[in-house]
Amino acid sequence: MNVSLDQRRAQYAWEKAQEAAQHRVIDEYTNLSKSVASLIMNSGLMQTLAFLQSKKDYQHKMLLVHLTKWLGRTLGGTPVNEGERFPHEPVADFQLVLAALYNSPSDLYMRATSETMALLRWIRQFADARKTLEEPS
């Protein structure tokens, strides 16, 4: 059975919402995932990743890891420039992803931004849905 990229995004987002709930930061993670999309649109992907890296709160670090690992999963191995490739998921961290982004051609940077926004749409929805499971009936 072939699974679409959007289905893979949905599965990944649900797993990450579950992780945030297990670490008891689902409320903060939900709010952050909603604001990060706007931040990307206003400031750009690299600036937003740097913002998440600069914060000490667990939910900021968690979302940063989720986004960089996803970019590694979907873009890993893509040529960035001569002899350099986008890092694969197991090693994709803030520093490696940032280096790949600032060395990448504009079409790859736009693709990374679009992919991040598409994932965030799922994360926002699933984090919000997962949050309601935590609320008393």
Show where each model-derived region lies.
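Small/polar/charged residue-enriched interaction surfaces, especially the RNA/DNA-contacting tracks
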Residues: M1-S137
